[in-house]
Amino acid sequence: MSTESMIRDVELAEEALPQKMGGFQNSRRCLCLSLFSFLLVAGATTLFCLLNFGVIGPQRDEKFPNGLPLISSMAQTLTLRSSSQNSSDKPVAHVVANHQVEEQLEWLSQRANALLANGMDLKDNQLVVPADGLYLVYSQVLFKGQGCPDYVLLTHTVSRFAISYQEKVNLLSAVKSPCPKDTPEGAELKPWYEPIYLGGVFQLEKGDQLSAEVNLPKYLDFAESGQVYFGVIAL
């Protein structure tokens, strides 16, 4: 082989080498793009499956048989428990009338459906407030009678004797009359019933004494339990 032929072969080899290198690089680039595309599709598919089956993302509320969301129901239960625990230590009283005495209104706490709790006290027929605060005060009485020989006015009053100014004042009061002023003929023989309910929210002080009274206790109806009562609830 001549020197010129060897030189030409070397030159041809040098010219072919970049072409081969370019082809190799192009093949490698295509392989990388294919691999990246595969990983992207696989990742998107995996993410879709995780979201679809609820493994990640917003959790679905499981349902009770009645259709209520489990998570919402649990939250409501915890809220109710918390509210119950917070209110369980508040003063409360509910007293009922003594039906064994006549022509007077005497309150009792040692009876069914009656209670004194968390500092409330019943003393001298009055409920004693154990702490400053807002209180719901309520009372109900039921009057009954036979006929209307005379014009009758029935009053029911809830009063407060305040420790701060040592004076008894009315908190709640109502007046009713079962008989009209002009009594119709035959009304003397008919029975009548008059309920009076009082209730309101008041700012009270520790030591305040609350009383619930009527002007004509002889007309009170004690025939059924739950008709005459008096209560205080701290808010």
UniProtKB/Swiss-Prot annotation:
A GO cellular component entry from the record: recycling endosome
Glycosylation-annotated residues: S83, N86
Post-translational modification note: The membrane-bound form is further proteolytically processed by SPPL2A or SPPL2B through regulated intramembrane proteolysis producing TNF intracellular domains (ICD1 and ICD2) released in the cytosol and TNF C-domain 1 and C-domain 2 secreted into the extracellular space. The soluble form derives from the membrane form by proteolytic processing. The membrane form, but not the soluble form, is phosphorylated on serine residues. Dephosphorylation of the membrane form occurs by binding to soluble TNFRSF1A/TNFR1.
Complex formation: Interacts with SPPL2B. Homotrimer.
Molecular function per GO: cytokine activity; death receptor agonist activity; identical protein binding; protease binding; receptor ligand activity; transcription cis-regulatory region binding; tumor necrosis factor receptor binding
Annotated protein name in UniProt: Tumor necrosis factor
Site feature: Cleavage: S34, L35, L39, L40, C49, L50, L51, N52, T79, L80
BP terms from Gene Ontology: animal organ morphogenesis; antiviral innate immune response; apoptotic signaling pathway; cellular extravasation; cellular response to amino acid stimulus; cellular response to ionizing radiation; cellular response to lipopolysaccharide; cellular response to nicotine
Organism (species): Mus musculus
Family the entry assigns: Belongs to the tumor necrosis factor family.
UniProt-listed InterPro entries: TNF, TNF_alpha, TNF_CS, TNF_dom, Tumour_necrosis_fac-like_dom
